[in-house]
């Protein structure tokens, strides 16, 4: 794997391999990188989980982390992302993890040799989050085939939803969507069925909630926190109707008592904290896969 830009770029075999490697890391597998490697985490949007878990993953692998602050970089002087990455490549950085507000920011960067891991591109995709979600689901159920998965909330503005709806259908899951119609697009019906939240909770094995992304809204939405929770959120009353073995997921950050009741965030059915933990192991698997391929290419070139 040279880069990780979108879930669509991964084959089912590659996905299964990454999930297996993540499971091995979780059960104590040690890193097997042979050469010194450097990574830079370039975040142009706020991030807690993605940024910190990539950094922890890098350090667990023995990868040196190069500091980068967009606000103090030469990009404030007009330097392009391409030229910034060209610089990183020139000084010996192997992989760049990038979070950017612009969708498809990585278009045109394929000429570079530095590997790119998409840490989220606007409302586009979030492949490492999608992979950790798959890892969490597989840990619980062992399979994706015929699982009923609900994706509920601010779907239109969610890069997580974009990644997950495509890959879950490809892996054999049955998808349901719910949330405000204003934040839904009929193009999603290619992947699943739209239903009101009260018609979904009793059906599904996985209740995947999405944050209300106020920063991406036009300001015309009419929901208060309380009214959103009442109409569309996972309330305590709705959660009581979930199947006995159903799980609750959320990519975080969580708006408590908006998309999910406060008391449910750390409840028995919740896998929200588990998702965060699993994020380190899946990101270790992603980085190891990329860096091992670089090692292999370098070895071939020396003969």
UniProtKB/Swiss-Prot annotation:
GO terms for molecular function: amino acid binding; aspartate carbamoyltransferase activity. Pathway: Pyrimidine metabolism; UMP biosynthesis via de novo pathway; (S)-dihydroorotate from bicarbonate: step 2/3. InterPro entries: Asp/Orn_carbamoyltranf_P-bd, Asp/Orn_carbamoylTrfase, Asp/Orn_carbamoylTrfase_sf, Asp_carbamoyltransf, Asp_carbamoyltransf_Asp/Orn-bd. Carbamoyl phosphate binds at residues 49-50, 99, 126, 129, 252-253. The keyword Transferase applies. It catalyses: carbamoyl phosphate + L-aspartate = N-carbamoyl-L-aspartate + phosphate + H(+). Keywords: Pyrimidine biosynthesis, Transferase. GO terms for biological process: 'de novo' pyrimidine nucleobase biosynthetic process; 'de novo' UMP biosynthetic process; amino acid metabolic process. The keyword Cytoplasm does not apply. It is an enzyme of class 2 (transferase). One of its GO terms (cellular component) is cytosol. SUPFAM superfamilies: Aspartate/ornithine carbamoyltransferase. Heterododecamer (2C3:3R2) of six catalytic PyrB chains organized as two trimers (C3), and six regulatory PyrI chains organized as three dimers (R2). PANTHER family: ASPARTATE CARBAMOYLTRANSFERASE, ORNITHINE CARBAMOYLTRANSFERASE, MITOCHONDRIAL. Catalyzes the condensation of carbamoyl phosphate and aspartate to form carbamoyl aspartate and inorganic phosphate, the committed step in the de novo pyrimidine nucleotide biosynthesis pathway. Belongs to the aspartate/ornithine carbamoyltransferase superfamily. ATCase family. HAMAP family: Asp_carb_tr. This is Aspartate carbamoyltransferase catalytic subunit. It comes from Listeria innocua serovar 6a (strain ATCC BAA-680 / CLIP 11262). The gene is pyrB.
